[in-house]
């Protein structure tokens, strides 16, 4: 379970990381992101200062804002608009940006979840649970069409195409029909562990944006294909 935090944070703490924690916990508890005034109240800051820190969080890719505004579009792993992935517990539910993010929600909230989606985002429905880091659907695959060093060139298209599949044949057919490359394919157990290592601290006050070096450590720990998962300074 999530640890407790004060109703407001000390006004001397103006870090983007603190704002990230407040945003994440608000989304977990309510299912939506706070507006600027509410976020300022939670942070114990003025709206002007909150806007400044929020922009800094955007600069380090800790949040995605609606263009030309301070409205929050997405806070990984949470999508704040409808998607093809719904993650639920007995007490709440959230949209996920992609298959990886759906597992990331489990890792961030540290509770068993049920994930409802479809194979390749198409008509074959999937409904499975993650309980204590395990799923009975051992046949599932998670596909990353594009390597991580390209993810922030366009955070919407790569993320939307990270999907679950129930077989190699289904994946190959999907890639052919939609003209997406066959990238890195992870068995579900590896995908769950990747989500745990990546998103496990996202609701923590100790969260920091991962550096290329830390990302590479995680990928190497899981034995991921270095030709696909190699990191560079372009991972922003």
Regions from the language model: what does each represent?
Residues 1-21:
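Short alpha-helical segments that sit at the start of domains
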Residues 22-26:
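Short amphipathic alpha-helical elements of helix-turn-helix/winged-helix folds
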Residues 29-42:
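Short acidic, hydrophobic short linear motifs in intrinsically disordered regions
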Residues 44-59:
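Short amphipathic alpha-helical interaction segments
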Residues 92-215:
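Mid-protein regulatory/catalytic core that forms ligand/cofactor-binding pockets
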Residues 203-236:
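Extended, charged low-complexity segments
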């Amino acid at each position: 379970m999530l640890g407790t935090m004060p109703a407001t944070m000390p006004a001397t703490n103006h870090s983007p990381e603190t704002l990230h924690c407040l945003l994440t916990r608000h989304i977990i508890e309510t299912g939506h992101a706070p507006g600027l005034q509410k976020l300022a109240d939670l942070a114990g800051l003025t709206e002007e200062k909150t806007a400044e820190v929020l922009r800094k969080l955007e600069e380090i890719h800790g949040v995605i804002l609606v263009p030309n505004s301070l409205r929050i579009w997405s806070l990984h792993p949470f999508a704040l608009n409808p998607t093809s992935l719904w993650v639920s517990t007995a007490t709440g539910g959230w949209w996920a940006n992609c298959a990886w993010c759906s597992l990331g929600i489990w890792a961030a909230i540290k509770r068993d979840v049920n994930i409802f989606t479809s194979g390749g985002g198409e008509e074959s429905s999937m409904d499975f649970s993650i309980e204590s880091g395990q799923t009975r659907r051992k046949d599932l695959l998670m596909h990353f069409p594009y390597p991580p060093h390209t993810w922030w060139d366009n955070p919407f298209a790569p993320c939307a195409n990270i999907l679950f599949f129930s077989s190699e044949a289904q994946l190959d057919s999907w890639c052919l029909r939609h003209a997406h490359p066959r990238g890195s394919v992870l068995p579900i157990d590896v995908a769950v562990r990747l989500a745990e290592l990546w998103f496990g601290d996202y609701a923590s006050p100790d969260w920091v944006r991962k550096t290329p070096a830390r990302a590479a450590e995680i990928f190497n720990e899981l034995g991921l294909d270095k030709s696909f998962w190699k990191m560079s300074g372009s991972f922003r």
